[in-house]
């Protein structure tokens, strides 16, 4: 009987964990001590293909917000991003000061293949329908 309870607890804890729908990897590269090339890679862990993916790449220097750029990683006319696959886009920023800035990417719009609904995604809130 104890074995069944232990197995039940292990299976329920494994299934009860939240899956993260997207993993985001940001890699800044310094180019000729004048520019920063920022590569943003997003991996789809959702069980559905993503037809459109848009977000904002924010630049920070310490705690100070310096600005942001809009990035569309997947357009409607491109093939959908399948589960387990990734897409990468790059953007350039000017080097301000001696040390490079830090960057953060936030997903603002997600549209799944075959749907008309548009969602926003946040790591703490999950998917929020916006259109």
Regions found by a protein language model. Give the residues of each.
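Sec-dependent N-terminal signal peptides
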Residues: 3-16
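Low-complexity, acidic Ser/Thr/Pro/Gly-rich terminal tails and inter-domain linkers that flank the onset
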Residues: 16-39, 45, 121, 126-131
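Solvent-exposed loop and beta-edge segments used for protein-protein assembly and interaction
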Residues: 32-34, 49, 83-85, 99
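Hydrophobic beta-strand positions in extracellular immunoglobulin-like domains
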Residues: 42-44, 59, 93, 109-110
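Short acidic, flexible loop segments centered on an aromatic residue
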Residues: 48-66
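Intrinsically disordered, low-complexity Pro/Gly/Ser/Thr-rich segments with frequent PxxP/GP/PP motifs
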Residues: 63-98
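Terminal connector regions
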Residues: 88-131
């Amino acid at each position: 009987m104890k074995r069944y309870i232990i197995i039940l607890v292990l299976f329920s804890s494994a299934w009860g964990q939240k899956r993260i729908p997207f993993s985001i990897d940001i890699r800044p590269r310094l180019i000729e001590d004048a520019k920063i090339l920022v590569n943003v890679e997003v991996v789809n862990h959702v069980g559905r293909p993503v037809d459109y993916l848009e977000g904002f790449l924010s630049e920070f220097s310490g705690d100070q917000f310096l600005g942001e750029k809009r990035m569309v990683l997947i357009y409607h006319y491109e093939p959908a991003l399948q589960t387990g696959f990734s897409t990468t886009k790059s953007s350039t920023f000017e080097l301000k000061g001696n040390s490079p800035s830090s960057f953060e990417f936030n997903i603002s719009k997600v549209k799944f293949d075959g749907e008309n609904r548009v969602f926003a995604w946040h790591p703490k809130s999950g998917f929020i329908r916006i259109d």
